[in-house]
């Protein structure tokens, strides 16, 4: 897959880059994408939901009245779930929602997501951006030059860069990640992927070695 490399003004530089077909040209596997997204979203859940049972709520454990002879129903004590303030029956308990996935499954899911972006022509390769200081306005201007001002974008860089990351994180709808931390959910959630030139050159190696979903 061959793409033009654009400069920060949104113009073609006259250079192109070849993205590997074994990643961007595969037939996407929807099921592994589903599994990877489910794993990602499950890992975001805290899972600490909890209600008290009749054994845990505060209150007397004394039986309210004798079992028989009153003409009323048998009740037990005040912690009975039938009473206000009583324990809960079958309420939520702490639970982990994350699931385990093999590395090969996660890699296939990531490549499938990239293949979808390639089919949608939603990948832009941008020449490397060097910023001396964090400047949100500067990066927002770059997006406008690329006609991506109102789109959700995922910016992929080869390694962490303080100035670039701080510049893009305050732009609405823009998410930044280093190539080794890229995951299936972020790829699919973005309308367009912006690869810096250096990241694009490392892409085939890093995706094959990555472990995140």
Task: Kindly label every feature range from the protein language model.
Residues 1-46, 92-213:
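Extended polybasic, low-complexity segments that bind anionic RNA or targeting/receptor surfaces
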Residues 32-68:
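A short, flexible low-complexity segment enriched in Lys/Arg and Gly/Pro that occurs
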Residues 54-90:
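Glycine/serine-rich anion-binding loops at beta->alpha junctions
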């Amino acid at each position: 897959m061959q793409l033009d490399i654009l400069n920060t003004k949104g113009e073609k530089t006259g250079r192109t880059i070849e993205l590997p077909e074994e990643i961007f040209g595969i037939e996407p596997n929807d099921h592994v994408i589903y599994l990877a997204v489910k794993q990602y979203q499950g890992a975001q859940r805290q899972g600490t939901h909890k209600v008290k049972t009749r054994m845990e709520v505060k209150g007397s454990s004394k039986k309210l009245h004798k079992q028989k002879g009153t003409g009323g129903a048998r009740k037990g004590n005040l912690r009975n779930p039938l009473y206000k303030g009583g324990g809960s029956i079958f309420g939520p308990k702490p639970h982990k929602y994350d699931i385990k996935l093999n590395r090969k499954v996660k890699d296939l899911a990531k490549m499938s997501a990239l293949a979808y972006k390639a089919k949608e022509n939603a990948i832009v390769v941008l020449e490397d951006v060097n910023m001396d200081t964090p400047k949100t306005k500067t990066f927002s201007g770059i997006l406008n030059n690329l006609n991506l001002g109102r789109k959700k974008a995922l910016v992929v860089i080869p390694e962490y860069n303080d100035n670039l990351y701080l510049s893009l994180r305050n732009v609405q709808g823009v998410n930044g990640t280093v190539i080794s931390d890229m995951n299936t959910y972020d790829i699919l959630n973005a309308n367009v992927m912006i690869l810096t030139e250096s990241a694009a050159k490392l892409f085939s190696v890093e995706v094959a070695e990555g472990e995140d979903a």
